[in-house]
Design a protein with these regions (language model features):
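Acidic-aromatic substrate-binding/catalytic surfaces of carbohydrate-active enzymes
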Residues: 27-30, 98, 102, 424-536
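Active-site/ligand-binding surface loops and adjacent short beta/alpha elements
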Residues: 584-588, 594-652, 659, 669
């Protein structure tokens, strides 16, 4: 390529999370994917790169065939280079190698079958890079991959001097790596067209190629972008300006690889894009990073110095959010089970279906949290959890996993043992270190984790909520990096945080007063809170059921034996409360269930209490003996019963999180609190019983 010319590798990455609402995909197609491809089709001279995740391609082929056929036509005439990747957009670095291969091969095979091409390059989900990837990707047939120029900056290179592609390796197996320009990521499509061309002109004669591939949703889905990009003509002007620039070659990545030598070798550290590194940090570290950036700016440090403030590591999300860690480790356990079962019975269709369900459960969106909602969005968590439960159910149906069965092991990497129980109807996790709490209550009859309630935690952006942050009045289209606005007033009142992780069979001893306990947050008033106490634990199989008994050694204020029995679709708990030998006691014993169905305030989601209140309501009843949480939409009833009769209270668990649309409240689940008055003579024992049964409607 002549020195006075510059190749510009422009492209888009289109993705919708597994489990996203159908109307969201329809809107994204109509507002971004289809109009972008239509304008591209009208200008045959424009050549660029497109990556669509496999699940989105499947949806387009079935639900928007015109858009799918348009993409196929563009690829067929060589105008678009399609990239492979993990079919369900997983974070490849954290998957077992056999799943890395399987995910890539599935998307590559789809493109071969339905488009007629074999992709050479790959899109790396969230650009999460780890140094072991070159060998695995190359062995999967990948010739080149894209990451951010941020990765290169962390290796000590100047982002403003980057161009072309670079060579890296692992164990001698090489891979080409293209740096994505952050400068162009922030300019396109938000700034005027000329700003991007001016920047490209500064790179002319210095590097052979510059690359900018970013989210296709920027071109019509993000707030304000549809009008800006299409109705006001930004994309037409951009394409016209690119074609009118004589020194600019519109190239695909394969064009550059075939025509240009590698720029240099490079070894990249663990990294993702800049924002991801910031989001992954624990809260205190996020605040320190913010101060460091401000201090550097005040001292006159430029972007080059700021590039070395690296932020965190993607895997830190697995520590930051224990619920995410549990999902990740469950995925790993199931991956091993699927692989072993397929090795024994490679032609069993049930196992093939289990493998596909496993891969769906590896979709990245519910495993982290940033400006796009992530793990705070229950429908995304539910989709991933449901896929993993489907995988587990199919393994059970094939006979690859026995039932009833239990194991006791450190199954989530936290150094403490959990008890994992499986029947033909349920799969659940009990935590001796959390007072015997249930943190997974998977109902295999509907592939639904009824216990999937995310705890309320402080996030760095909550300070903006308290300050009443609003979008400023500057003209122009805002990027996701601008301060978001609240979607409703009064969100600051919801900024309460949980001292203990959300779960079920959270229990404790309270005073004998008459002041009602808060069903959502009772624990600060507890005289004894079992979720804060590790308990002794024994487990055994008993006549087709699994019995797990937790004991507390201390006698004050009461000694506790908590016997949990799991049989088919029912979990029963029996409490034996004993007063100290020489001291009578009086108080209240309470047990909390945190349960997640599909919505808090939607038709067909309610409690069977008086008046059938919604799952998102708050209420209280005295002398109740049971209640059911009903979700007619998904077809599940969670039936609670207890004896003797007790006070029942309930309320919604709501978080405040941020998405590209602004700050918003999100219903995570319903907290149900059952409270018994208990008076014991010295040395007396009393037994209380409660149960939950999950049923199909």
């Amino acid at each position: 390529m002549p020195d006075d010319r510059l190749a510009f590798c422009f492209g888009i990455h289109n993705h919708q999370p597994i489990g996203n609402f159908d109307h969201v995909l329809v809107e994204a197609t109509e507002r971004a994917y289809r109009p972008f491809l239509e304008r591209l089709h009208a200008r045959s001279e424009i050549r660029l790169v497109v990556h669509c995740t496999g699940s989105l391609l499947e949806w387009l082929r079935e639900r928007a065939p015109g858009t799918f056929d348009l993409l196929v036509a563009l690829a067929g005439r060589g105008q678009v280079e399609l990239l492979t990747g993990g079919f369900y957009e997983p974070i490849l670095a954290v998957l077992p190698d056999h799943d890395k291969f399987g995910q890539i091969e599935r998307l590559t095979a789809f493109l071969k079958t339905h488009v007629g091409i074999r992709p050479r390059g790959m899109w790396l989900a969230e650009r999460v890079w780890e140094p072991h990837l070159p060998r695995v990707l190359a062995e999967a047939g990948v010739e080149y991959v894209l990451v951010d120029d941020r990765h290169f900056a962390l290796a000590g290179l100047d982002p403003e001097a980057l161009g072309g592609y670079y060579l890296t390796e692992d164990q001698g197996t090489r891979l080409r790596v293209f740096p994505i320009s952050q400068r162009l990521r922030y300019l396109i499509p938000f700034a005027e067209v000329e700003a991007s061309l001016e920047y490209l002109a500064t790179r002319r004669g210095k590097v052979p190629a510059v690359t900018m591939v970013d989210d296709g949703e920027k071109f019509g889905v993000w707030p304000g972008t549809h009008a800006h990009v299409y109705e006001k003509g930004w994309l037409d002007r951009f394409f016209d300006r690119l074609l009118a620039t004589e020194w600019l070659d519109l190239a695909t990545l394969s064009d550059v690889v075939d025509r240009v030598e590698a720029t240099a070798p490079v070894y990249l550290p663990t990294a993702s894009y800049r924002e991801m590194g910031e989001w992954a940090l624990p809260l205190a570290a996020q605040r320190r990073l913010e101060r460091a950036k401000h201090d550097l700016e005040r001292l006159g440090g430029g972007d080059a110095d700021a590039d070395l403030l690296r932020g965190g590591f993607w895997r830190t999300f697995l520590v930051k959010y224990p619920e995410v860690a549990d999902t990740y480790w469950k995925m790993l356990r199931l991956s091993g089970a699927v692989r072993g079962a397929l090795a024994r019975a490679p032609h069993d269709g049930r196992l093939t279906e289990a493998q596909v369900a496993l891969w769906r459960g590896q979709a990245n969106d519910a495993y982290w949290h940033g400006v796009f909602g992530g793990c705070y969005l229950p429908h995304l968590r539910r989709a991933v959890k449901s896929a993993l439960l489907e995988c587990e159910r199919r393994l059970v149906e094939s006979g690859a996993l026995p039932t009833p069965a239990w194991t006791r092991e450190d199954g989530n990497g936290d150094g403490r043992e959990e008890v994992y129980v499986r029947t033909r109807e349920l799969t659940l996790t009990l935590n001796p270190a959390l007072g015997g709490a249930i943190t997974e209550l998977g109902y295999l009859g509907r592939d639904l984790d009824v216990g999937d309630v995310l705890a309320r935690r402080p996030e760095i952006y909550h300070a903006e909520v308290r300050a009443g942050s609003r979008r400023d009045g500057r003209a122009g289209v805002k990027t996701i990096h601008d301060a978001p606005a609240p979607k409703e007033a009064g969100l600051e009142a919801l900024l309460a945080y949980d001292e203990v992780r959300r779960g079920s069979l959270l229990d404790g001893w309270f005073d004998a007063g008459t002041t009602p306990l808060d069903p959502v947050s009772p624990w600060e008033r507890a005289l004894l809170a079992l979720p804060g106490e590790p308990l002794g634990c024994t487990t055994r199989a008993v006549g087709g059921a699994i019995a797990v008994t937790f004991t507390r050694g201390a006698e004050a204020p009461v000694s506790v034996e908590k016997a949990v029995t799991i049989r088919e679709a029912t979990v029963e708990v029996r409490y034996r409360l004993t007063a100290p030998a020489a001291t009578p006691v009086a108080g209240r014993w309470a047990v909390q269930w945190n349960l997640a169905l599909t919505a808090g305030d939607a038709p067909g989601r309610y409690l069977t209490a008086t008046g059938r209140p919604s799952l998102g309501s708050t209420g209280r009843e005295r002398d109740a003996a049971g209640v059911a949480l009903v979700d007619e939409w998904i077809g599940v009833r969670a039936r609670l019963a207890w004896a003797p009769a007790a006070e029942l209270a309930w309320g919604p668990v709501q978080t405040v999180s941020v998405s590209e649309a602004g700050f918003e409240r999100i219903y995570q689940g319903t907290a149900v609190l059952v409270v018994w008055p208990v008076g014991l003579r010295a040395g007396e024992t009393r037994e209380l019983v409660a149960s939950i049964t999950l049923e199909r409607l």
